[in-house]
């Protein structure tokens, strides 16, 4: 049985607004950043690194791609950064857009709160950049 967990570690990452959000392209960059190994050879260290990209993951079964939902992080200049448009896409999915996201309601609520915090963090970063 899945044990969906909200990944608050994304709050420690820097935020940027300077990138369009393409989840598929981002996924390719992310996997390359995680490891040069084929994902079938990944161990616990690679999966811990992979987890940093997502708002929600299944802590019961963290060793498969289906255990991760709502990506918001990409690689920018060789470093992981929260992408503002990725956060917006996650918020929309949590609100039901694009067929929504299949998660228990309590997890959706916590993920929504986390996404709101990330959005506020990105708003502040954007304000600083505009000054």
What is each model feature region?
Residues 1-131:
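Extended terminal accessory/targeting regions
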